[in-house]
Structures are given as C-alpha cells and as structure tokens.
C-alpha cells in the first residue's frame, strides 16, 4: 500500500511594521527623567545642573560602531560610542532659587563633556547637534555660549580639552583637517600577524575589542590621531607639535610648559590602548 504525503504550502508574509507604543502609564515610567547631575564650580558659589534622557534613542543604538584597541567608538562622531550625554544644562548659585539656562547652543544639542575654568568664570563644553562635536565656551554669569573652535573635537580617547591655569586658554584635541576618507577593508596587509610564546608558563588576562590586523591598525591611526591646539577664550589659536595619538595632556601650574603623553607604534594586539607604551614630550608655551 502506497502512502501519499501531501505537502501544504503555507505562505509566509513578512511585513515592515513600526515600533509599538506601550500604554501611557508604562511609557511614563520608562521615560521618566533620571536624577540630574550636579557640578560645583571651583569658587564653590556657582553650580551646574545637567539633565539627561533615561534611555538612549534608537538612533544612538543603531549608530555605527568600531571596536579598536579595547575602545568602542562611533566613527561618524569621532567619539566613544553610547557614552553619557546631557540634553539640558542650567546654572545656579548657592542660596539663590533663580536658574540661568545655557543660551547659544544649537537646537537639540547634546553635551558630551564639560570642564570649569580654574577661576570658575567659564565652562568649556563638547557639544554636538549632528555628526560632529564642537568646542563651546559658556559665560557663567550670563549663561551665553559660543562656538570657540570650528574644527571638530576628537573624543575617541582621553579628555578632549584641558584648561590652562590662567583660565584664559585651553589645550584641545582636534580631528585632523583634510584627513581624507577612512581606510577600506580590502587593503593589502603589510605582513602576517605573529605571536611569540617564550618564557615560563603563566596565566594571562584576556581583553575584548583588541586590534587584530593591519586594517585595524589603520583605522586606529585614522580615528584616534589628534592635532593639539592651544586656543584662547577669545578664539586665537596655534598648533602644538605634530599630530599623534594623545593619551593625556598636562599643563604646568605656571602655564609655561605642557606635558603631552603620545602613543607610538608598534601597537599591541594583546592589551588595550590604556596599557600601551608612550613617550612624554614636553613643549614650552610661548
């Protein structure tokens, strides 16, 4: 007796659908603002209140991401990916109920980093409104802000700027002008990736997001290299040294010297950039 098997063809329809919105009671709980961040000025009189969203947006979560030398970056913004940003900032004085909002920032601006001047009269801000992050400076007394440097900041690694002790200028890490386009994956490797297993057997820590190829090295150079700029609060600027991968910038207390920690090749494939070797050139301020 023959058995006849009938195969039923069930059509599968895939439709593009939009995100569904939960009931308002649930949405209000999820979207409730987080506790604001407070930052006290060096003079212990003024303070800054910064607000941020409770959850990252779909745009932020879907942004491109590169994993290089133990650091995850957003290549479109030349900054760490999914880092905390603030959507609103207001100035207050201790003992006063009145607040001063920061004025002059772009619409829908996000503040990625900020720093009080040593005298407490100004605040430097790393602000984005699109794919680039720029340096703004705010007057603490009036709340008025203005863009100080048109070149985009480099926020991939380390602090993007630091104040000099006189509160009249900052040292800034900027993306290189005319740096061209990012390296393509099809580039020919310069040689094989090799590791040596010498010495005694010992346990070794492992890390994620490390460099793995010459292509990763090329991307690391492209996105992490900065030009150091000395810029006054009035907008006068001058370049300091040659471009490099800057780990740290330390101005001397008297303002005459600046110690700059720079990372050089060969880059490590077994530890993140925070563990790599560096050189310590010192430049004299003129």
Model-derived features: where do they sit?
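Positively charged n-region of N-terminal signal peptides that target proteins for export
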Residues: 1-4
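Bacterial N-terminal signal peptides
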Residues: 7-13
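Beta-propeller folds
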Residues: 16-283
């Amino acid at each position: 007796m023959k058995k006849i098997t009938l195969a039923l063809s069930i059509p599968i329809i895939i439709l593009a659908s939009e995100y569904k919105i939960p009931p308002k009671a649930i949405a209000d709980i999820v979207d409730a603002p987080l506790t604001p961040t407070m930052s006290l000025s060096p003079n212990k009189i003024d303070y800054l209140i910064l607000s941020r969203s409770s959850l990252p947006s779909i745009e932020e979560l879907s942004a491109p991401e590169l994993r290089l030398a133990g650091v995850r970056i957003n290549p479109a913004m030349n900054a760490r990916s999914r880092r905390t940003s603030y959507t609103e900032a207001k100035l207050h004085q201790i003992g006063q109920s009145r607040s001063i909002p920061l004025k002059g920032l772009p619409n829908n601006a996000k503040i990625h980093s900020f720093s009080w001047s040593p005298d407490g009269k100004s605040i430097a801000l790393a602000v984005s409104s699109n794919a680039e992050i720029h340096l703004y400076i705010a007057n603490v007394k009036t709340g008025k802000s203005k863009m100080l440097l048109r070149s985009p900041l480099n926020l991939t690694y380390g602090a993007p700027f630091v104040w000099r002790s006189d509160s009249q200028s900052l040292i800034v890490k900027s993306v290189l002008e005319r740096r061209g386009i990012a390296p393509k994956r099809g580039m020919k490797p310069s040689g094989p990736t090799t590791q040596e297993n010498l010495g005694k057997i010992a346990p070794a820590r492992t890390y994620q997001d490390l460099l793995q190829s010459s292509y990763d090295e090329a991307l690391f150079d492209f996105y992490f290299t900065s030009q150091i700029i000395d810029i006054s609060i009035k907008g006068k600027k001058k370049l300091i040294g040659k471009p490099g991968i800057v780990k740290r910038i330390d101005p001397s207390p008297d303002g005459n010297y600046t110690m700059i920690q720079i990372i050089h090749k060969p880059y490590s494939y077994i530890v993140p950039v925070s563990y790599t070797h560096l050189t310590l050139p010192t430049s004299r301020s003129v």
